[in-house]
């Protein structure tokens, strides 16, 4: 639940009605408080209010002009305002003919701005800037993230409001922009996207989302010597609406990490891209994680990631910017975007992919008094199938790749670090290896 605004605070009701100033003021008028030293003010002024309307602060506990107040009654107003829970401090200060209500509000709009520097084998070294704030809009969380290096440029924004429809349905809006131009690719791509979605959590462990949005994306700057398939797939842009459906379920409760218990998580995403055009696509993605305990400090992690993209009407072909090309962190031991059909040295990706992993992990935090997880793993998978093989000139068949390696995850200060060393033992001609992989991030 996001923090609530001041106007959601109950007004002078129930038990603390006796502390509100209205009955106190009436009592003073009836008994002639002014004759006993009460002071009347011509005006009431609020100081220090940032987000709460000054009129609300005055009237919530009955601080009004023209009414005589004893000192004890001014203290009662302070107690009444403090009891609302939205102020850190409240002080009523007589200043001549003006009663000053000096307040300091509790921060109901917590947020942060941070710069970051991160490295991932997939994207390289990236500088970032992140901003988030709760109640950026009334009862609405908002965030903005920017990332940049010469090959990767990204920007994203998000608005999220809970309990839009009853107490179960939330509303979100996502905006995104990305331009990628990697040195190891013969092309560049750009995507602009906006989506509005509803989220429903039938339980604390299950989440369902349904979204509708609009996307514009393009494939450009294809090298002259690139694969003829890439040249034919070049496009100045496809702009069209899309639909998204998602289901996430996890046996893990918030704060649990999968050690010492048998747990799992599963996620399904279904996209329908480019609706209303000749390039309409179905894009299905699946992921699962299973944690099998091998004692309190050891476990087996079994994972599967898979996906398939295909034409909705069976007539149009996918493009490289639609297809899957796992590698680096998503398929350890192989270079980024490297697994799948190739032509003329270019990675083309496949319409279908699947990567599974079995990893034995040990938790060594108790030995070194710091977060430390080490493991040994075997990854295996493939990416295959094209709509156009240039007259069977391109081999798009299923060819399994496999690798074995060691992984390590720890923290340096507050910066998480994960790395692996892997060696492919089942590969195809033309595959590029990546023996060492690293991911780290630090914020300041």
Predicted segments, located by residue:
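Short strand->helix junction
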Residues: 11, 67, 273-275, 425-427
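A short alpha/beta connector and helix-capping loop motif
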Residues: 390-407
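Periplasmic polypeptide-binding modules associated with outer-membrane biogenesis and secretion
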Residues: 35-118, 130, 145-163, 192, ...
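Extended hydrophobic
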Residues: 411
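C-terminal outer-membrane beta-barrel translocator/porin domains of Gram-negative envelope proteins
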Residues: 115, 243-372, 376-387, 391-393, ...
């Amino acid at each position: 639940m996001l923090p609530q605004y001041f106007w959601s605070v109950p007004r002078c009701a129930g038990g603390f009605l006796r502390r509100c100033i209205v009955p106190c003021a009436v009592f003073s008028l009836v008994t002639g408080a002014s004759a006993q030293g009460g002071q009347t003010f011509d005006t009431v002024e609020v100081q220090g209010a940032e987000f709460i309307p000054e009129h609300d602060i005055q009237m919530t506990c009955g601080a009004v002009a023209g009414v005589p107040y004893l000192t004890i009654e001014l203290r009662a107003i302070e107690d009444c305002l403090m009891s609302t829970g939205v102020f850190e401090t409240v002080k009523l200060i007589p200043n001549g003919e003006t009663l000053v209500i000096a307040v300091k509000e509790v921060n109901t709009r917590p947020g942060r701005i941070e710069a970051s520097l991160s490295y991932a084998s997939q994207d390289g070294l990236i500088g970032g800037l992140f901003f988030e704030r709760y109640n950026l809009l009334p009862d609405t969380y908002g965030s903005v993230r920017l990332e940049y290096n010469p090959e990767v440029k990204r920007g994203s924004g998000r608005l999220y409001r809970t309990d839009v429809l009853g107490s179960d349905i939330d509303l979100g809006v996502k905006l995104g922009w990305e331009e990628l131009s990697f040195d190891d690719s013969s092309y560049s791509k750009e995507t602009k996207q906006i989506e509005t979605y509803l989220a429903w959590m039938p339980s604390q462990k299950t989440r369902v989302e349904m979204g509708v949005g609009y996307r514009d994306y393009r494939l450009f700057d294809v090298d002259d010597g690139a694969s003829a398939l890439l040249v034919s797939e070049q496009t100045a842009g496809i702009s069209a609406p899309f639909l998204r459906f998602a289901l996430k379920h996890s046996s893990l409760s918030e704060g649990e990490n999968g050690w010492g218990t048998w747990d799992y998580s599963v996620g399904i995403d279904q996209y329908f891209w480019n609706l209303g055009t000749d390039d309409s696509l179905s894009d299905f993605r699946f992921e699962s994680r299973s944690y099998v305990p091998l004692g309190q400090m050891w476990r087996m992690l079994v994972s599967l990631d898979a996906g398939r993209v295909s034409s909705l009407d069976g007539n149009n072909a996918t493009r490289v910017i639609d297809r899957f090309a796992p590698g680096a962190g998503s398929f350890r031991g192989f270079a980024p975007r490297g697994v799948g059909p190739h032509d003329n040295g270019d990675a083309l990706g496949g319409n279908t992919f699947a990567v599974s992993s079995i990893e034995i992990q040990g938790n060594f935090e108790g030995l070194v008094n710091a977060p430390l997880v080490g493991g040994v793993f075997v990854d295996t998978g493939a990416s295959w199938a094209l709509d156009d093989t240039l007259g069977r000139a391109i081999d798009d068949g299923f060819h399994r790749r496999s690798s074995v390696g060691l992984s390590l995850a720890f923290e340096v200060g507050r910066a998480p670090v994960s790395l692996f060393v892997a060696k492919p033992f089942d590969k195809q001609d033309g595959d590029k290896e990546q023996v060492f992989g690293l991911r780290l991030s630090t914020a300041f």
